[in-house]
């Protein structure tokens, strides 16, 4: 398969995995291992990365094996998002940042105006910017025009498990994209992840679908395989949809024994 390229980074795996809500660290680590994810995301605000006395994800993971993608979860405006991103950078983490500016506490949908503003400000600061956005086609294009390094449209609200509720809009975003499209949020099953890849997405970022599963380790493996299958299917090219049947076996040139 073709590698996933985001800014200066190249990855074999197209599964980006969140690190929150796992039952315990052992389950988390095993799930990460079987997923073969190379990019791990986490909320900067949920860790005291400057306090050595406070245990956190970075202490327990072999961070040299992964590319870390800190996110600005908890930010309510562009200024807060930029502040969180700078905190992550100052701690020595990757310059790549997932911009997350929530505009509605009930749906956890992103604020389009503040997301645009934060993305522009962080690009000016030299960050590799991956904004979490809705399935708004125009907003995705405007983010792309700013120069972001990937676009991360939600399939449905964060943690909902509803899957891809608007595949048409998602397909429009993918068709117009000149940067990678990573489907983020709302994935609930391996079928959802495979569908995203079949639509032409470059990758899938998920967390709750794995960490909240009855068996997170098995689900991590299932997501890995479904994303690989969906991508292979997209690269192979599906047959055209037709209204009428077409015989799969040739009828001409066959001798009929009476």
Swiss-Prot record:
Active site (record annotation): 98 (schiff-base intermediate with dxp)
Cellular localization per UniProt: Cytoplasm
Gene3D superfamilies: Aldolase class I
GO molecular function, a single term: thiazole synthase activity
Keyword Transmembrane: no
Gene Ontology cellular component annotations, sorted alphabetically: cytoplasm
Pathway: Cofactor biosynthesis; thiamine diphosphate biosynthesis
Coiled coil: none
Keyword set, alphabetical order: Cytoplasm, Schiff base, Thiamine biosynthesis, Transferase
Family the UniProt entry places it in: Belongs to the ThiG family.
HAMAP family: ThiG (MF_00443)
The protein's name: Thiazole synthase
Organism expressing this protein natively: Bacillus thuringiensis subsp. konkukian (strain 97-27)
Gene name per UniProt: thiG
